[in-house]
């Protein structure tokens, strides 16, 4: 069980919620949420794919299978190569074999069901929506491979979806860089209302949001981030998850 949330986290989440409740602006407030490593922990997705791979190779390569079976959730890193190193898989041919198998499945509807919401995430997004905000999910997932699974997972976990005031923005092309997509997508939310808060795990996206919407409360989820990520802007807040108690 994780430790109780820090007072700073509780106060920040309540402050955003209170801003929505007391909103007096001409346009409706918009709160933006990323999905992977923000609302959802997608490391279980990687573990499931690895375990599936193990079942296919355990007879032919028991040594590789045993190494992969030693993987635990806390060993799953942002980069698969780092994850494989954590369980002792270094050989280039093995790394390539596992990586190809993983890549064919990770960005696919069928495996999104493995994702797990971070603590308090469904409840908090529901509260934001119930308080009167439009909610925008802006994700680096792509339309062709992940739209159906994403909608189903949001629904199954109790996030608001498929109702008025909910936006879901995905990349039109899986090969498009996430930051480039968000650089183009975030400004379009001006059509929906005024962006007052944004939650994302990537420092680059948080800094981008702060430059696009200076008055906005921008919050980084301290989960996983791309290696070599830029330093967070001074006025970006940091939390661990969405628990308020």
What is the meaning of each model-derived region?
Residues 16-26:
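A short acidic-Thr-Gly-centered motif at the start of a beta-strand
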Residues 120-127, 185, 205-212:
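A short acidic, amphipathic alpha-helical/loop segment
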Residues 141-196, 207-211:
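Substrate-recognition "cap/lid" segment bordering the active-site pocket of phosphatases
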Residues 29-36:
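Short, hydrophobic/glycine-enriched beta-strand segments
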Residues 192-240:
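Acidic, Mg2+-coordinating phosphoryl-transfer loop and its flanking beta/alpha structural elements
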Residues 1-17, 68:
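Long, acidic (Asp/Glu-rich), low-complexity accessory segments flanking structured domains
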Residues 2, 36-156, 165-171:
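Alpha-helical substrate-recognition element adjacent to the catalytic core
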